[in-house]
């Protein structure tokens, strides 16, 4: 992941500074700029079909920052904030699968693949987008491609995205007893309404 950020230039410094603050990892924050959007209440869910029982969880504490002028984005997901229907399933998820005390956050940094075209047409209509970036989960980082939409609505940047991941790719160990009864791929959905960042200096305590 370090190499990817380095190759993206200094623009990532603006993105990751606010993201760290939103995720509760940094102190005072100063942000300048136009066309930049943030949220700390993004929504993410995942679903995996299973013969034994479908696995589904939701999280409304996603921190995200999007630089609309460059097409770069980043988000951070607190793993322990995923909510399940069953408490026991949530405990297994955190303790046995995700090891959330050791790996408390999942992160993504990416770039719109067709940024120039999207940014030109975005003010007038919802745009289908493709994002390529680095997803870090359970301490493992992989390059992923994500499909979604962008829309400017009521002074907010509305983001929808969807992609699939394979837990095995991120060294998430599923017990042998249930391995054959759980889908090899997990469907992920993301929904965020990001507020514009004021062009003046923003400082948070």
Regions found by a protein language model. Give the residues of each.
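Low-complexity, acidic/polar, glycine-enriched regions of mature
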Residues: 31-205
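Bacterial N-terminal signal peptides
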Residues: 12-28
């Amino acid at each position: 992941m370090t190499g990817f950020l380095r190759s993206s230039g200094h623009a990532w410094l603006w993105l990751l500074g606010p993201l760290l603050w939103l995720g509760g990892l940094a102190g005072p924050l100063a942000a300048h700029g136009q066309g930049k959007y943030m949220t700390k209440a993004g929504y993410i869910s995942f679903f995996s079909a299973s013969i034994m029982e479908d696995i589904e969880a939701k999280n409304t504490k996603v921190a995200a920052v999007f630089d609309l002028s460059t097409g770069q984005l980043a988000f951070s997901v607190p793993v322990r904030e995923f909510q399940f229907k069953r408490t026991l399933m949530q405990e297994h998820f955190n303790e046995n699968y995700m090891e959330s005390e050791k790996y408390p956050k999942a992160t993504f940094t990416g770039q719109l693949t067709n940024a120039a075209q999207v940014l030109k047409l975005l003010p007038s209509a919802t745009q289908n987008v493709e994002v390529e970036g680095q997803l870090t989960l359970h301490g493992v980082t992989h390059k992923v491609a994500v499909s979604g939409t962008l829309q400017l609505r009521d002074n907010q940047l509305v983001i929808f995205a969807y992609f699939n991941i394979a837990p095995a790719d991120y060294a998430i160990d599923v017990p042998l007893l249930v391995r054959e009864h759980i889908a090899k791929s997990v469907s992920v959905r993301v929904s965020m309404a990001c507020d514009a960042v004021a062009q003046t200096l923003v400082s948070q305590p």
